[in-house]
Amino acid sequence: MSRVCQVTGKRPAVGNNRSHAMNATRRRFLPNLHTHRFWVESENRFVTLRLTAKGMRIIDKKGIDAVLAEIRARGEKI
């Protein structure tokens, strides 16, 4: 399963670890992903999404129906 938020589209970023001597070694910055089940009243079922903590805040703000409409408009199957 890919490490991509279904709401925000955030994916791993790359950068460097820096030691005290400022030596650079490559690393990945992973998104804060969680699998969460949401009850969708209009569909009378649960929907499971893999999303970041920011994605959860967006759902709190806009509502699950609006966010699902955006995801489906992008062509993702839910």
Swiss-Prot record:
Xref: Pfam families: Ribosomal_L28 (PF00830)
Coiled-coil residues: none
InterPro entries: Ribosomal_bL28, Ribosomal_bL28/bL31-like_sf, Ribosomal_bL28_bact-type, Ribosomal_bL28_sf
Gene3D superfamilies recorded: Ribosomal protein L28/L24
Source species, domain of life: Bacteria
Keyword Ribonucleoprotein annotated: yes
Keywords: Ribonucleoprotein, Ribosomal protein
GO terms, biological process: translation
GO cellular component: cytosolic large ribosomal subunit
Molecular function terms, GO-annotated: structural constituent of ribosome
Assigned protein family: Belongs to the bacterial ribosomal protein bL28 family.
Protein known as: Large ribosomal subunit protein bL28
Provenance organism: Haemophilus influenzae (strain ATCC 51907 / DSM 11121 / KW20 / Rd)
Lineage: Bacteria, Pseudomonadati, Pseudomonadota, Gammaproteobacteria, Pasteurellales
